[in-house]
Amino acid sequence: MSDVAERVKKIVVDHLGVEESKVTENASFIDDLGADSLDTVELVMAFEEEFGCEIPDDAAEKILTVKDAIDFIKANAAA
């Protein structure tokens, strides 16, 4: 697993308080991990801070799973 994936999963575990074993790449933030809309906004902000990238609102709306976040960050992050 890549460093980006590990960092994304750690942020998800820390922000949502879920078990690390539940944070798989195909896990939906809302359906599988119990996030609400505020949680997803906070996750996006945490990803921006951790990886030094900006995630525009239209892109953030498409980040529904852990893999979506990893793929976006790999394509756009400075770190």
UniProtKB/Swiss-Prot annotation:
Keyword Phosphoprotein tagged: yes
Segments passing through the bilayer: none
GO cellular component terms attached to this protein's record: cytosol; membrane
Ranges where the Carrier domain occurs: 2-77
UniProt keywords, alphabetically: Cytoplasm, Fatty acid biosynthesis, Fatty acid metabolism, Lipid biosynthesis, Lipid metabolism, Phosphopantetheine, Phosphoprotein
Any one Gene Ontology BP term: lipid A biosynthetic process
Keyword hit for Lipid biosynthesis: yes
Gene3D superfamilies: ACP-like (1.10.1200.10)
Modified-residue entries (O-(pantetheine 4'-phosphoryl)serine), positions: S37
Metabolic or biological pathway, per its Swiss-Prot or TrEMBL entry: Lipid metabolism; fatty acid biosynthesis
Annotated localization: Cytoplasm
PROSITE patterns attached to this UniProt entry: CARRIER (PS50075), PHOSPHOPANTETHEINE (PS00012)
Gene Ontology terms for molecular function: acyl binding; acyl carrier activity
Modification after translation: 4'-phosphopantetheine is transferred from CoA to a specific serine of apo-ACP by AcpS. This modification is essential for activity because fatty acids are bound in thioester linkage to the sulfhydryl of the prosthetic group.
Family affiliation: Belongs to the acyl carrier protein (ACP) family.
Function: Carrier of the growing fatty acid chain in fatty acid biosynthesis.
Protein's name in the database: Acyl carrier protein
Protein's organism: Azospirillum brasilense
Gene it is expressed from: acpP
